[in-house]
Amino acid sequence: PNPDLFPPRMIRLSDHIAAAGGWLSLEAFMQLALHHPQEGYYSTAIENIGSRGDFSTTPTLSPILAKAVAARWKEACARCGRRLPLLEIGAGSGALAVKVLEQLGFWNRLNTDYVIVESSPRLREFQHLLLGSQAKIYSTMEKALKHCGGKAFIFSNELVDAFPARVFEYTEEGWREVGLTVKDGAVREELRPVRQQPLFSHMLEYDSQPGQRLEIHDSYARWFTGWLPLWNMGVMTVIDYGDEMERLYYRRPQGSLRGYKSHQVLTGEELYRHPGLTDLTCDVNFTDLLELSRNCLGDTVTLMTQRDYLLPYAENTPQDACLLYTSDAA
């Protein structure tokens, strides 16, 4: 059927605010807008992924990331003394998977499991159509790790920033959590006292200037610690956009929460006008991510820029030069 005849439905935000008791945290709003099973962005609104769609990401621009992933996988296999399955979390259109499989070469493709974890039914359809029998696709990490026997080379690209985040604002009374309420028939932001401290972040222990906002990915921490005990051998690479705390919020009083709709950047109250039809994201605080990772995995966790990760595999092309010298991912 022609999708234009059956456009995605926009979420009735006021109904969900009422169901939550009159105040909905921004984390809950993002969860609803992105992952609602019938009306969320990842369920209905994604049509094109790449240079003309809502996502324009490294795998669609250059094979350099696939080269790096394939090389690091080989290093991990040598270190572990066995052939590890490749496990990609949040594979999007499957573009990176295709390029990684190409980089593996015929023999490795034939003898290595390529496993994808994708929570979005719509994206799983994309991946099945593109990859066919070349990849095993699961909806959860638990199912994927069971398939792998707990041993895998795990990697993700732009995954953490797709998780819902809690948003906080500093006031004269200290930190408050940002949520949504309905006033005079319109959806408005409202600050409330912090009732539950973040799981791993220490961000709220610091004072700031009134009005300063920041985001904390508690939902990622809950998800990560939920499946981690099932993983008993391998290497993990997490690639995302962000910075360490001091630089991330320097001259960014409103934080980094933003939306993308048809390549237009939305901020402020524009974020709440098209729930379910807008891709929502915020930059990753690597100070928090390192704290979480080292708490769970020890001192083996390291942080590097995307440039340093990719540089050994770069070629003299405009695409590679763009990725190496304009990216702040790590």
Labelled PLM ranges:
Residues F155-P198, P253-S262:
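A mobile, often basic/glycine-rich helix-loop segment
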Residues N2, Y325-A330:
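Conserved small/polar residues in nucleotide/adenosyl-binding loops
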Residues K151-A152, G234:
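Conserved acidic residues
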Residues F6-I89, S93-K151, F168, D308-L311, ...:
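Rossmann-like AdoMet
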